[in-house]
């Protein structure tokens, strides 16, 4: 137990006690900007507020001055409650101040964690490599590891129903009681106010209106969840040498005393699953993958272990159907915009030895990735590039732009999709996406000039085709000199993983969320 507590104290030795005064300093945003923390919840245009995203940091910096007045926010909230039926202006002001407080707290609390991350990287002499941040960097790992695994659990990570659970986790990191009380007051008033307008306000809506604060609390929850999941696996070599009582404390060191009887039985039954030496864990956004070389029975043990773990540690129930167990040789799984699978190919070889000949059958495994064409067409349809059936249509909202801007926008989307889906082993779906975007571009130009799409294709066929393919071909040529072209019939099965994809295209990101 002392070893584990020391491990935790080492990570949490930088607890801050000065956060609350910083909330009322307008120049804290300058300090935040110096540490690369200037992203804001206002990065999307807020039509209700009437501000553009270019002035988001200035907006928050100026509005924080109004919080200097004593109990100004509390009086404003009480005044809103007393005049709730006056009109929509009350909701405007409450939403306005809630975003100020949410943004201010998120910026303040990110600073010590950012400094801790930078110092830890410097102490461990870990180089800052953008290649490791690429979403494509995970696929070579999958290609190398999944070939040796048998089963895979596709996990949809649950999140707490109430934000108070996330605040309780934050208490173990930050000792500033005033800041935590202010955050609890904000969340309490936020839910009370919205319950008067929209009954049963969900955490999903809170995540949309307070993105920065929500993602900070959510990432903290993911860190706690993964730490408690990975730590027993790392310590599995010591499990046979310690008593069951220490094992109970090692795994459930934060569990409440009333749950000890339940957890003791639970640990004794599930502890042996951590001894699997071929377990692999991968996470992205709200999904994770747990792969193992073991049996289906072992994966079911992992499934019920996770369900009970979320229930007894985080105090919320997770439905078992959120964890789907699949056999890699029979099923494919969806991850990061690709349908991935492990295919088994058989080959026959005839061997001749003197006068005798015999046949040998060999089985080889291959990691395969394909583009999910139907969900991607649905995403293009939602963006008004085509119909639900995949028929290209014009983009009316872009008809007011110049011709070169229209072509550049379509070309940029096409190149980004080609860039991201270059790892597909079958390119037919990628070519279909390019065809839809190319014809949608022609129809948009034709609608602007009140002409037909066929005439534009005849006049601009070569130029339009070059706009959609040239830049992508140059990038591939620089990275892979042996590849000459990337046209319709070139590099048909060549899979390329780029290590510069830090941000996913909006169409792909929409696909990740809706699938």
UniProtKB/Swiss-Prot annotation:
It comes from the Eukaryota. InterPro entries: Domain_X (IPR024937), Maturase_MatK (IPR002866), Maturase_MatK_N (IPR024942). GO terms for biological process: mRNA processing; RNA splicing; tRNA processing. Keywords: Chloroplast, mRNA processing, Plastid, RNA-binding, tRNA processing. Disulfide bonds: none annotated. GO terms for molecular function: RNA binding. It is found in: Plastid, Chloroplast. GO terms for cellular component: chloroplast. Belongs to the intron maturase 2 family. MatK subfamily. HAMAP family: MatK. This is Maturase K. It comes from Zingiber mioga.
